[in-house]
Amino acid sequence: MNNTIINSLIGGDDSIKRSNVFAVDSQIPTLYMPQYISLSGVMTNDGPDNQAIASFEIRDQYITALNHLVLSLELPEVKGMGRFGYVPYVGYKCINHVSISSCNGVIWEIEGEELYNNCINNTIALKHSGYSSELNDISIGLTPNDTIKEPSTVYVYIKTPFDVEDTFSSLKLSDSKITVTVTFNPVSDIVIRDSSFDFETFNKEFVYVPELSFIGYMVKNVQIKPSFIEKPRRVIGQINQPTATVTEVHAATSLSVYTKPYYGNTDNKFISYPGYSQDEKDYIDAYVSRLLDDLVIVSDGPPTGYPESAEIVEVPEDGIVSIQDADVYVKIDNVPDNMSVYLHTNLLMFGTRKNSFIYNISKKFSAITGTYSDATKRTIFAHISHSINIIDTSIPVSLWTSQRNVYNGDNRSAESKAKDLFINDPFIKGIDFKNKTDIISRLEVRFGNDVLYSENGPISRIYNELLTKSNNGTRTLTFNFTPKIFFRPTTITANVSRGKDKLSVRVVYSTMDVNHPIYYVQKQLVVVCNDLYKVSYDQGVSITKIMGDNN
């Protein structure tokens, strides 16, 4: 060894008491044995709007504790005609609500979307929940007997506070019967389809077939002690209102804020969807691909099959077509002598006043080149220059034809419109498919009448992404960084006498152009507060809401 290294050790002070960093004293743990346990549930249709509910009862004298719940769901074979695919992470999006109860009431519960949010940084959990090209890509059936999707099973990890530190945090049964209840979303929320797919029959025949698995622990001479858990509580604000309030807040560990689009029953049809590939570029490429067949047409005469309001012009020899204040260059090779190239100049357009600004999708293309195939009667596009963005891809079809639009907005062909897709994904956030557009310009949180926090930038979102290693567009105020399980979580504590028992959130939405159709997508503010509870095992399993620092 180097002399400097040797001397630095020899010269050390031996009189100082030092901790051993090369060995530890091993301790003999509680005697226990874990096992993977699976059970079937009892299905009912007692949920809101006749939603399916699965109940799983866990009562075994040899199961002392449990955690790490996994829900298995069978997806059936899909046959028929039309376009069809499952939404990404379909297993999570099947779930509306999960609760764990004992004879003393609900121990813990969570909304399906918050469960998904909690697992969004777990790539393995997301993969097993139904994220694959086989499930998520849009497949096509051409005859009634065509198989569109093969049967499959997805596995949904139900992340709970009882998983945080394995055995330490596990839910102890204390000789109690534990019931896990899962409420499912409507089938329309988990599929993407076009109008030719027979969804009515599929919906009638679709049956949720769940199985619950968990790790059960048999423990010898268990010594159960009280513990703390956080339980999320979600409040959804009124449509287009910038405020939402959570009441009866006594001890909260965090507060999260995000927005959701509200499409309603008629606004959930879109022009395109990329399927399994979910990057922003994939959304844009899928959208552009759908538009091109209507935008550039090779025909032996003026194109047919379009509405009378469509403005389709023949491309001149120099390839330059002027659309209002923009020029589009079009060059298609190998066009037969008896045919011409046409450009659709008002494919999709929107405006709130005549003779004012017009939002015209055709103008967003600046150069289009390709080659016409006489064998397939189609154009193979080689280079497309455009400014289409994720917001464009996220505009519901209904907004192009809404009463707010003073123009005939949707001038696509009937053939193209028939390929539009119904998308009712329940977990979409923001106003675009990727939640890229930050529509909150200012956030203020009040605890009672006092301002707890305010920001004019997305700092709380940036910190949430850094701390959770996920990018879901949620703004979060965290009041607890205390190591879990071994310490009582730190909370913001109420003072009821001073009116400090509610958290009020107010946002200022970002300014948007009223001539852009996305401006009219309705939105809702969502606030999620994590309340602190104490779990006791004196007489079965029960929880008590923490009301202050002294609990």
Swiss-Prot record:
Annotated consequence of substituting residue 480 to D: Confers 80% resistance to rifampicin
Q: Keywords of this protein's UniProt record, alphabetized? A: Late protein, Membrane
How does the entry describe its membrane topology? Peripheral membrane protein
Give, from the UniProt record, the effect of changing residue 25 to V: Confers 45% resistance to rifampicin
What result is annotated for mutating residue 25 to N?
Answer: Confers 60% resistance to rifampicin
Q: What is the effect of changing residue 94 to Y?
A: Confers 30% resistance to rifampicin
Tell me which GO cellular component terms the UniProt record holds. membrane
* BP-aspect Gene Ontology terms: response to antibiotic
Q: What is the effect of changing residue 234 to I?
A: Confers 50% resistance to rifampicin
Q: What would changing residue 314 to K do, according to UniProt?
A: Confers 30% resistance to rifampicin
Q: Known consequence of changing residue 30 to I?
A: Confers 50% resistance to rifampicin
What InterPro entries has UniProt attached to this entry?
Answer: Poxvirus_Rif-R
Q: Which GO terms describe its molecular function?
A: identical protein binding
Role description: Scaffold protein which forms a transitory spherical honeycomb lattice providing curvature and rigidity to the convex membrane of crescent and immature virions (IV). This association occurs concomitantly with viral membrane formation. Targeted by the drug rifampicin, which prevents the formation of this lattice, and hence virus morphogenesis. In the presence of rifampicin, irregularly shaped membranes that lack the honeycomb layer accumulate around areas of electron-dense viroplasm.
Q: How does it assemble?
A: Homotrimer. Self-assembles to form a layer. Interacts with OPG158 (via N-terminus); this interaction is necessary for OPG125 association with membranes.
| Family in the record | Belongs to the orthopoxvirus protein OPG125 family.
Q: What is the name of the protein in this document? A: Scaffold protein OPG125
